[in-house]
Amino acid sequence: MKIAILSRDGTLYSCKRLREAAIQRGHLVEILDPLSCYMNINPAASSIHYKGRKLPHFDAVIPRIGTAITFYGTAALRQFEMLGSYPLNESVAIARARDKLRSMQLLARQGIDLPVTGIAHSPDDTSDLIDMVGGAPLVVKLVEGTQGIGVVLAETRQAAESVIDAFRGLNAHILVQEYIKEAQGCDIRCLVVGDEVVAAIERRAKEGDFRSNLHRGGVASVARITPQEREIAIKAARTMALDVAGVDILRANRGPLVMEVNASPGLEGIEKTTGIDIAGKMIRWIERHATTEYCLKTGG
């Protein structure tokens, strides 16, 4: 099987592991920078070119598309899809998951529990927005933020008003969310492949912080998840129509709450913590689904 990995940096852990896992199972792998792909959109002879050459047909494409290049990255992936390549996460699903507001709306519609959340663009009535989510303490986020950037814990009403007013000056979309104190700076990252949670870790924030992101200095350990948490993680990934997803869950007194569904979850922290060959599981999923029938069905 010929597999393309779409990534701006092939030296990253996740890309290297996926490449190794694919090669170990006898596949040919090429890492392509999606921003260097350019496309001929033609009803008679569509194609993708890369650094001066027309690309051959790939049986499957693994998107490792960063948030900053979502628009062009998903456009390139969509072109591969139109040419009959099987995508490990479809372009439309990635775009859906990257839209935090749309994601939360879809999860809520499916009855998946979330922290109480409000969203606004430059709200005129900051006080009412704070009341809407139950008052302080609360978390204020920029909708476009990633890896804990643009996330502030406001412990008092006055602090919340100050943060919201400051964000309002950025002319940005603001997300205001209840603070789950009982989570104590921890969350659970469930790695879903298909209809299975293949690994789970607990991420604990570093001292003095409440953001558990490993990129922000959080510490990971193996997590034992409940059947309810497993079911919610799988349901959240299905709601986003993602074959591979990192589902972040907070353990609240009222039950597990989904914080986020990540369409391009990093493998380093969770593989090194659990010792599970997640990259291999992803390749085996591709082997089961990147079939000749799929290629014919999609016109490749």
UniProtKB/Swiss-Prot annotation:
Keyword Metal-binding: yes
Family affiliation: Belongs to the RimK family.
The keyword Manganese belongs to this UniProt entry's keyword annotation: yes
One GO term (biological process): translation
EC number: 6.3.2.-
Annotated InterPro entries: ATP-grasp, ATP-grasp_RimK-type, ATP_grasp_subdomain_1, RimK, Rimk_N, Rp_bS6_RimK/Lys_biosynth_LsyX
One family name in Pfam for this protein: Rimk_N
Molecular function GO terms recorded: ATP binding; metal ion binding; ribosomal S6-glutamic acid ligase activity
Name by which UniProt lists this protein: Ribosomal protein bS6--L-glutamate ligase
Keywords: ATP-binding, Ligase, Magnesium, Manganese, Metal-binding, Nucleotide-binding, Protein biosynthesis
Binding of Mn(2+) 2, residues: E260, N262
Enzyme class: ligase
HAMAP family according to UniProt: RimK (MF_01552)
Cofactor(s) annotated in UniProt: Mg(2+); Mn(2+)
Cofactor: binding details: Binds 2 magnesium or manganese ions per subunit.
Ranges where the ATP-grasp domain occurs: 104-287
Annotated Mn(2+) 1 binding sites: D248, E260
Biological function: An L-glutamate ligase that catalyzes the ATP-dependent post-translational addition of glutamate residues to the C-terminus of ribosomal protein bS6 (RpsF). Is also able to catalyze the synthesis of poly-alpha-glutamate in vitro, via ATP hydrolysis from unprotected glutamate as substrate. The number of glutamate residues added to either RpsF or to poly-alpha-glutamate changes with pH.
Binding-site residues for Mg(2+) 1, renumbered to this chain: D248, E260
Cellular component terms per the entry's GO annotation: cytoplasm
